[in-house]
Amino acid sequence: MLKKNKKANSNNSGATAYSPLAYLKRPYFKRSKACPLEQCPNEDIDYKNKGLLSKFTSEYGRILPSRITSVSSRKQRLLSTAVKRARYLALLPYC
């Protein structure tokens, strides 16, 4: 929200001036999230592991993005290929 000063502009147009602090951006702090599959070896991410794969899919059957699940990019690739294989073999729904 922009804060208005009570002073009028010097050109007497009747408009109010905005505070210069209103235009500064807030500092952005990126939170470091640990990968939930960090301790899980790559062999456990398999198309037959239906319980693990269902944690990373939505209720409509879509693969959740890594920004929501905080999975590393390597594990996200393994998850996506495993989910696609499980869908092809009818272990997971396409919905």
Swiss-Prot record:
Highest taxon listed in the record's lineage: Bacteria
Keywords: Ribonucleoprotein, Ribosomal protein, RNA-binding, rRNA-binding
Single GO biological process annotation from the record: translation
GO molecular function list: small ribosomal subunit rRNA binding; structural constituent of ribosome
GO cellular component, one term: cytosolic small ribosomal subunit
UniProt cross-references to InterPro entries, sorted A to Z: Ribosomal_bS18, Ribosomal_bS18_sf
Any one Pfam family match given in the protein's UniProt record, by short name: Ribosomal_S18
Protein family (similarity comment): Belongs to the bacterial ribosomal protein bS18 family.
Assembly mode: Part of the 30S ribosomal subunit. Forms a tight heterodimer with protein bS6.
PANTHER family recorded: 30S RIBOSOMAL PROTEIN S18, SMALL RIBOSOMAL SUBUNIT PROTEIN BS18M
Biological role: Binds as a heterodimer with protein bS6 to the central domain of the 16S rRNA, where it helps stabilize the platform of the 30S subunit.
Name used for this protein in its record: Small ribosomal subunit protein bS18
